[in-house]
Amino acid sequence: MALWQQGQKLYLPPTPVSKVLCSETYVQRKSIFYHAETERLLTVGHPYYQVTVGDKTVPKVSANQFRVFKIQLPDPNQFALPDRTVHNPSKERLVWAVIGVQVSRGQPLGGTVTGHPTFNALLDAENVNRKVTAQTTDDRKQTGLDAKQQQILLLGCTPAEGEYWTTARPCVTDRLENGACPPLELKNKHIEDGDMMEIGFGAADFKTLNASKSDLPLDIQNEICLYPDYLKMAEDAAGNSMFFFARKEQVYVRHIWTRGGSEKEAPSKDFYLKNGRGEETLKIPSVHFGSPSGSLVSTDNQIFNRPYWLFRAQGMNNGIAWNNLLFLTVGDNTRGTNLSISVAADGNALSEYDTGKFNLYHRHMEEYKLAFILELCSVEITAQTLSHLQGLMPSVLQNWEIGVQPPASSILEDTYRYIESPATKCASNVIPPKEDPYAGLKFWSIDLKEKLSLDLDQFPLGRRFLAQQGAGCSTVRKRAVATRNSSKPAKRKKIKA
């Protein structure tokens, strides 16, 4: 007989995880496809910062910024369908599913150059041709560099998540002195249009971590540099923030420099020997950093200007655009050419070169075009499906105007005619206006409500989709008309030998 020994641990089975259904289990595809595309989308601005001109503002348009497109699709439940038999409004609701997407970019390729006129680069740490034993009160230098090369394409029906490091609140027992290094924590935020990408200096909140105003290039000086939180979005139970993504990052260290300043965490004497003069402390900081470089820009490694077909998403949402919304997050600094514009200060043509007689301006331009292939789908209104959507995304049921019917009241209620008049009482039970959950966020809004078409063969992406299905552009071939002679040919007579 087996006996339970004293002190032996009892391992219980883990708590079962609440399952999230894949969208394919309750979404029926109708095999009706639409094409949607935008016009040529253009934006122009200053590549480093925002400029105020009179009562107007020149926006900041940098190649190192994210472009986040909020795409509004038409409501398919109010759509004029070619076949009324495909939809039963009393038993199902229609939704859109993304089948294909193409982000086209114009403008020539060019490296993204950034910099700072007073950059904190004390010494060149990779070339040991001279020895500097002390630093002055101001050793900042004019510095320029090409940023880390990045291409990002990310599609979902909710905004993408970004991560960054920032200062954290210290513990009560850890009272920080003035000038001490603050604790750090990793935070998340939605990636908005105009947020800065990580360009080789780390994903961090440089508004709080850059007191010298000289440690970074101008375009990220007072910004939060974000890096897409692929780990968090991949673990999202709903799978709404990232259907799929494509990315390419490229960087190498061009120069190695030393920062200037008072190093409070200098290496101790256990790491080096003192010199003959008895000096035991280092006078040059040991804070080294690398100058990033994106290197060669080529058409061989472009992720744009090509179609992407979504057969199976990485999450549980297989491309369903809930609430008729899509969020397309794009980052691309391979077309980072900035225009240097010189204008005569007095408006007259210059006859000789004089730096005081012309004004300099800086501009960056971007060009986009978006195209989508959408499939019409339906969701059957059942108790299981509604319960699942209520726990997953309640706003879907609110937009479908599906809710619990309250019981009929037996109390006689009052209805005022002029309820907004000062002569009557204040209105009660007023339905609040519908709020946009993304009202406080900044996106490039694109309205495609009137830009859907069933004629796929009339658009480049539509023709590529038809080719994937084995159906190309077919033309009516004219058959050759066979001419017949009314007179029958005479039969040959056989002659016996």
Curated annotation (Swiss-Prot):
A single GO molecular function term of this UniProt record: structural molecule activity
SUPFAM superfamilies to which the protein is assigned, alphabetical: Group I dsDNA viruses
Pfam families on file: Late_protein_L1
GO cellular component: host cell nucleus; T=7 icosahedral viral capsid
Subcellular location: Virion; Host nucleus
Single biological process term from Gene Ontology: endocytosis involved in viral entry into host cell
Record keywords, A-Z: Capsid protein, Disulfide bond, Host nucleus, Host-virus interaction, Late protein, T=7 icosahedral capsid protein, Viral attachment to host cell, Viral penetration into host cytoplasm, Virion, Virus endocytosis by host, Virus entry into host cell
InterPro entries documented for this protein: Capsid_L1_Papillomavir (IPR002210), Capsid_L1_sf_Papillomavir (IPR036973), dsDNA_vir_gr_I_capsid (IPR011222)
Record-linked Gene3D superfamilies: Major capsid L1 (late) superfamily, Papillomavirus
Principal location: virion
Assembly behavior: Self-assembles into homopentamers. The capsid has an icosahedral symmetry and consists of 72 capsomers, with each capsomer being a pentamer of L1. Interacts with the minor capsid protein L2; this interaction is necessary for viral genome encapsidation. Interacts with protein E2; this interaction enhances E2-dependent replication and transcription activation.
Function description: Forms an icosahedral capsid with a T=7 symmetry and a 50 nm diameter. The capsid is composed of 72 pentamers linked to each other by disulfide bonds and associated with L2 proteins. Binds to heparan sulfate proteoglycans on cell surface of basal layer keratinocytes to provide initial virion attachment. This binding mediates a conformational change in the virus capsid that facilitates efficient infection. The virion enters the host cell via endocytosis. During virus trafficking, L1 protein dissociates from the viral DNA and the genomic DNA is released to the host nucleus.
HAMAP family linked to this entry: PPV_L1 (MF_04002)
Similarity section: Belongs to the papillomaviridae L1 protein family.
Protein name: Major capsid protein L1
